[in-house]
Amino acid sequence: ALACPEGARAIDPFTTHRFLMALEASGSTGKGSGWLARPLTLRDGVPVGAMPLYVKSHSQGEYIFDHGWAQGYERAGGSYYPKLQVAVPFTPATGRRFLCAPELRSALLDAAISLTEQNKLSSLHITFCTEDEAEALAGRHGLLHRITQQFHWENRGYATFTDFLNDLSSRKRKMIRKERETAQGRGLTIRALTGDQIEPAHWDTFWQFYQDTGSRKWGTPYLTRAFFTEIHRTMRNDVLLVLAFDGARAVAGALNFIGRDTLFGRYWGCSEDHPCLHFELCYYQAIDWAIA
């Protein structure tokens, strides 16, 4: 019922102990971050359920924007923060938030609500849960169901990237082929790395890419450098790192996390601008890898 045995391929890499601990051990969450971990566990002699739960002192890093709610709550005389958040920090990826059998969800929800009330927190929020969880919990204990949008690519039985292209209109096929030719025709070498193919030095380079992206408009680099060291140590087999090299020097990269049947694209950055390289590394290389 829990995420998975350590070392096994998780359905969702973001709710594994190793991912959440990488955030905490690296200082990306914890004291001073506005994300204070308060995980819930459910036991029946042995662990039978868990929930990633955080006391939040702000709304940053959630990718669900409730600042208007916070302002309205405080204009009415209340204090919106701290609040209680069921979520994976900095990760707007849909996945299970109730790590238990369906019949045990209500026990975890009751415990989270009790924690909210006992600590006089303003509210309880559950973000990016599965559709099944949302439907099962809507209306329970006054929970309001809010729907947002995401874009997911699905493999409809494709054996090759060409099969995928053949499923598109002629205009879109030509556009993607042209973009790939542009990105791949500039003398760069593109490598998709996972597991022991990833070297510690690759993270030094990717950290610079991550910082560059975070420094741009609307960007916020929530992760610390130590986070990348932690995931290299504990979950590099769950990572696909796509890098573009100019000779021996990496000039751009995209970081993906590998689930049991899903590839999750998360971060991108570069030290040089090259036409169409963002699309190549973040989308087309990832789709290629997922199909293979």
Which residue ranges define each predicted feature?
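A conserved beta-strand-loop-helix scaffold within acyl/acetyltransferase catalytic domains
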Residues: 1-72, 113-117, 122-275
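Short, intrinsically disordered, charge-balanced linker/junction segments flanking boundaries
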Residues: 1-2, 42, 90, 285-292
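Conserved acyl-donor/pantetheine-binding loop and adjacent beta-alpha core of acyl/acetyltransferases
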Residues: 54-97
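Noncatalytic linker/hinge segments flanking ATPase motor cores
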Residues: 77-84, 89-95, 165-169, 192-196, ...
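Short, amphipathic alpha-helical segments
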Residues: 88, 92, 102-106, 110, ...
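A short, internal acetyl-CoA/4′-phosphopantetheine-binding micro-motif in the GNAT/acyltransferase core
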Residues: 91-104, 268-276
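Conserved acetyl-CoA-binding loop-helix of GNAT-fold acetyltransferases
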Residues: 102-114, 274-288
